[in-house]
Structure formats: C-alpha cells, structure tokens
Amino acid sequence: MAHIGLNEDEARKQNLDVIIKKLPVMAIPRAKTLGETDGLLKAVIDKNTGEIVGCMLFAPDASEVINIVAMAMKTGQDYTFLRDFIFTHPSMSEALNDLFAL
C-alpha cells in the first residue's frame, strides 16, 4: 500500500473540483503474471488544472510505483505526463497509463 497527496474527501473539503480515476489491479498484465490480482489504484485529479492532487495504490510494488507519481507531482506535471509516458511491459508501473487515461 502507498499513498501521496490528498484523498478524495480531503480534496473535496478544500473545494477542489476533482476527477476520481480507479483501476482494479486485476486489469494490470504484470499483476496477472505475478498471480497477485487483488487491489486497486486510485487517482485524484484537479478537473480544472489536470494536476494530480493525490494517489492511492493498493497493489504489488506500490511502494515503488508511488515514487513515479510523486516525481510527476513534485515536478509540476499534469496527469497527461503519466498517461502518455512509455513504460516497460509487463510492469506494474505501466498501469499508470491506464489509470490516468481519462
């Protein structure tokens, strides 16, 4: 499990207009090859700016994948950076393409 930034409730309490994206781990090819398909990836995105304001990962290798999201957030990238980034296949990080596909 890994988390960065705001969760959905925290974002709404700050009056942010957010888009919530979810991806079940069973949809990730690498999770299938690992035989670990339980879990969920969830992203909180500011609808007006495209900024990633939070991300929660309940998945294999979450402690590694969250670092990629953190880097995107800290360098001011919007969600399209991770949506369009080319990741190796199969990898847990490639799930970020699907998570951030709006």
Regions found by a protein language model. Name each.
Residues M1-N7, R12-L102:
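Flexible, glycine-rich terminal cap/loop adjacent to redox cofactors
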